[in-house]
């Protein structure tokens, strides 16, 4: 089996695994590492096919979750996933109820695609991205990154930061990226997450154009024991646009649920 790239940092007693989103890699967390490393031992990974974790075929969500969990340096951890990484973390939490201490999703949805009475990204838009990747790889990735920061005061700087993360490591293949878009287009974990055993924290950006804020209220009703926080001035990447507020909120939520060691 191919090996995933893992990096472990920090000196806290609580283990926190960070899973990045579509098109990115583990460097996306740089803005919060120093803020969290005294509270957690952080485990950063490049998901299969992304960054330094090359040589993987196109994977289903279940396959990706299984590979990440099996190679994790510490399994008894809080699993935090951003965007697509939120689906991976959710799948891991559902499949490994005795190991996962808590699940935290950031700017993520158990169902990214819009359906009747469910806000999200129109499936044909995701399908269109798949086609555009084949036509103009770099332009499509740039467009997707720009969508993630749209509306924030620091949108231009945040997009530049995301682009730098992408370019700093080996680029994922068109096939890997299309596989990720297919997961976003087709996966629906809404019902399964009602059976989740561990604490579940959800963090959102008020200005997020990919995961509409209405999702938070709908899931508040569906998962009454799961606290949610909406960052008023953030979009799809609150830990980049508002790293201090994000880190403070994360710690407060973990303390409130008594999941810090």
UniProtKB/Swiss-Prot annotation:
Per the record, the major location class is cytoplasm
Q: What keywords does the record list, in alphabetical order?
A: Biotin biosynthesis, Cytoplasm, Hydrolase, Serine esterase
This entry carries the following GO cellular component terms, namely: cytoplasm
Residues in coiled coil = none
Please provide, alphabetically and separated by semicolons, the GO molecular function terms listed in this UniProt record: pimelyl-[acyl-carrier protein] methyl ester esterase activity
What does it catalyze? 6-carboxyhexanoyl-[ACP] methyl ester + H2O = 6-carboxyhexanoyl-[ACP] + methanol + H(+)
Domain AB hydrolase-1 spans what residues? 15-243
Q: A Gene Ontology biological process annotation?
A: biotin biosynthetic process
Q: In which pathway does it act?
A: Cofactor biosynthesis; biotin biosynthesis
Q: Which EC class, in a word?
A: hydrolase
Q: Which InterPro entries match?
A: AB_hydrolase_1, AB_hydrolase_fold, BioH, Carboxylesterase_BioH
EC number(s): the record gives 3.1.1.85
What are the subcellular locations of this protein?
Answer: Cytoplasm
Q: Does the keyword Transferase apply?
A: no
**Binding residues for substrate:** 22, 83-84, 144-148, 236
> In the UniProt entry, which residues are flagged as the active site?
83, 208, 236
Q: Which Pfam families match?
A: Abhydrolase_1
Summarize the protein's role: The physiological role of BioH is to remove the methyl group introduced by BioC when the pimeloyl moiety is complete. It allows to synthesize pimeloyl-ACP via the fatty acid synthetic pathway through the hydrolysis of the ester bonds of pimeloyl-ACP esters.
Describe the subunit structure: Monomer.
- Give the similarity note: Belongs to the AB hydrolase superfamily. Carboxylesterase BioH family.
Q: What PANTHER family does its record include? A: HYDROLASE ALPHA/BETA FOLD FAMILY, PIMELOYL-[ACYL-CARRIER PROTEIN] METHYL ESTER ESTERASE
Q: What is this protein called?
A: Pimeloyl-[acyl-carrier protein] methyl ester esterase
Species source reads Proteus mirabilis (strain HI4320)
């Amino acid at each position: 089996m191919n090996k995933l790239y893992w990096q472990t940092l920090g000196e806290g007693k609580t283990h926190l695994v960070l899973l990045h989103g579509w098109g990115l890699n583990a460097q996306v967390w740089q803005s919060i590492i120093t803020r969290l490393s005294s509270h957690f031992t952080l485990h950063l990974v490049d998901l299969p096919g992304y960054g330094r974790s090359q040589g993987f075929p196109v994977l289903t969500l279940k396959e990706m979750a299984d590979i990440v969990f099996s190679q994790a340096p510490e399994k008894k951890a809080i699993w935090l996933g951003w965007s697509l990484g939120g689906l991976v973390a959710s799948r891991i939490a559902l499949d490994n109820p005795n190991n996962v201490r808590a699940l935290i999703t950031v700017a993520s949805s158990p169902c990214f695609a819009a359906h009747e009475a469910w806000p999200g990204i129109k499936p044909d838009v995701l399908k269109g991205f798949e086609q555009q990747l084949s036509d103009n790889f770099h332009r499509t990735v740039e467009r997707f990154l720009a969508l993630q920061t749209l509306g924030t005061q620091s949108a231009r700087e945040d997009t530049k930061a995301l682009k730098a993360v992408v370019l700093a490591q080996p680029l994922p293949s068109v096939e890997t990226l299309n596989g990720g878009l297919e997961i976003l287009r087709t996966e629906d974990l809404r019902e399964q997450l009602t059976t989740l055993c561990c604490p579940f924290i959800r963090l959102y950006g008020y200005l997020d154009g990919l995961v509409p804020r209405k999702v938070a209220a709908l899931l508040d009703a569906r998962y009454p024991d799961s606290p949610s926080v909406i960052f008023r001035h953030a979009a799809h990447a609150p830990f980049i646009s508002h790293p201090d507020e994000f880190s403070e909120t994360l710690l407060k939520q973990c303390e409130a649920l008594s999941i810090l060691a």
